[in-house]
Amino acid sequence: MEGDRHTPPAAASVSKVLDDDDLLVEILLHVGFPTTLVGAALVCKRWLGHASEPAFLRRFRELHPPRLLGFYIDDRYCDSAPPTFVRMLPQPAELSAIVRRTNFSPYRRLSPGMLDCRNGSVFVTLHTDKSALGVHRPLCHGGGLTVLPSLPRPQLPLGSSCSFRQVLSKEGDGLSYYYLYVESSNRESRMHVYMMQDGSWRRHHLLDIGQLPRPRSTPKAVLVGNKIYMAAGPSGILVLDLTTSGFSTVQLPQGVEHGSRGTTMLSRAGDASGVYLIHVKVFQLCIWLRKGGNWLPVDSICLHDMCANLSKSDSTIKDWHTVLLMDQVVDYGGFVFLQMGGCVLHLDIRCRTLRKVYEYRSTRYRDIHPFMMIWPPIFPALKYDPASNLKKKDTRKLMDCTCVVKLRRE
């Protein structure tokens, strides 16, 4: 009987929220993470409608930009060991269960090797065939490991070899996969562009690069909208427009060259409006945004004092006079990973803070693969609408959200 006395106030609170669209939207805006938003949207179709509305998602992203959850690194003594996942600390308690799903222990027998991370999807090669490709989606319920068909192997003419290859992906009406393969000889270069269609790789384009500068294997290429940006030559970028099948070239800002490994990096703009260029020379890190046909200066940071202070406070960091950009593909999010000696450093560009996040176990310094919170959220379809008969756990979820909004306002 005592429980009945508490039912009317709770029911009245729930009813008040369900009858007020503006209040409900305000609560959903403050759930904190896209994965939590998906859970809240499962309550009923009405909640799902609000949570999946484009204008709402734009506001949600402004309040909660995609978060760096950690990174994968292929730091292993033998090819049979799975990639290592390193969490970025601290992490909110709500994300603990999700981050636990990032490891590859269940797939150890397949000896996965890292290729890339993109918006919550992890691309790996599989030991059964180094051309076989697997996709792991830790942030999706029941994501598991999806095995894609083996990567194509073009038949090369005598005297030609593969000088560049990379798997790329993009979101749209589903997830699209592209595979770039450049064959080169002393006289010419050709680019094979494959696209995953109906469960198989199909050639999308076969293009002569001609007299254009050849793509470089580092820094890695990025796909922005329908254009692929590839570092090429000593100081250029080769741009492939997938819509027109045409190439164009872009020169780096004056005085900037790709140089040796760890000098430049390309990064996608989060809204797919352009591409960022990040350049390190000695201790100077500079950032530009390519937009409207011009390079726009974004930021410039002197790393000397930060590196010196970090070396003094941590005796494990050696050779602090050499700072390199780690080859990484990620949407520009105000951070970058650097390599100094045998350590991985995380530079928060906005806060101007530098910290060590990993120390290599082997002397083979592999690439790093940042793992970001998924965006936009993937909402499942609801087969029925329980809005008129909410379960107790849904009521508790609503009350928790209401408390979060109240506390943040105070």
Language-model region placement:
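N-terminal entry/capping and adjacent linker segments that precede and initiate structured domains
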Residues: 1-410
